[in-house]
Amino acid sequence: MNLEQYTKINNFFIRHSTAFSLLLTANRLLTACGFLLYPLLLLCLLTKKNIAMLISFIAIPALCFLAGTIFRKVVNKKRPYEKLPIQSLIKKDKKGQSFPSRHVFSIFLIATLWFCFWKPVGIFLFIAGVFLAIVRVIGGVHFVTDVCAGALLGVLAGLIS
């Protein structure tokens, strides 16, 4: 997105406080949704005594998350509020490390794992992931390329698991 688009979006949310509150709430709830469902998946695998899948669903995502974190530090891509003269709607003091989006990576990874285990929950999380990606871009903390890369890498990491 460019400066004009971000300005229009920011102005809309500044004028409509209810929409602004919904945006911030959506960011928190969608993020929490993925992170709460991941331990539940691991618990399900444990109760089904599927230890091989449990180990795989812990070890590979952890390694991918670590590799992604290191990659973000090396690339150190600026965030929209650093590159453009805008105020992000989602408050974030962090500089750089925008690419790929770790929030979107995580929810798409968890969605893929759930999809392999129980498709309805996976589908729900994929939909939540799309909304989270939109919220992160509208909120001014990521560019579209950041969230698209996060989604793609999350799915790939999930498939490897």
Predicted regions and their residues:
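N-terminal transmembrane-helix/juxtamembrane module of multi-pass inner/ER membrane proteins
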Residues: 1-37, 52, 68-96
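Membrane-helix interface segments
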Residues: 18-19, 49-53, 80-81, 118-123, ...
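Hydrophobic alpha-helical transmembrane segments
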Residues: 33-45, 115, 119-126
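Interfacial segments of alpha-helical transmembrane regions
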Residues: 39-67
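Membrane-water interface at transmembrane helix exits
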Residues: 43, 68-76, 115, 158-161
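Small-polar-interrupted transmembrane alpha-helices in polytopic inner-membrane proteins
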Residues: 59-72, 123-135
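Membrane-embedded catalytic cores of phosphoryl/pyrophosphoryl-handling enzymes
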Residues: 85-161
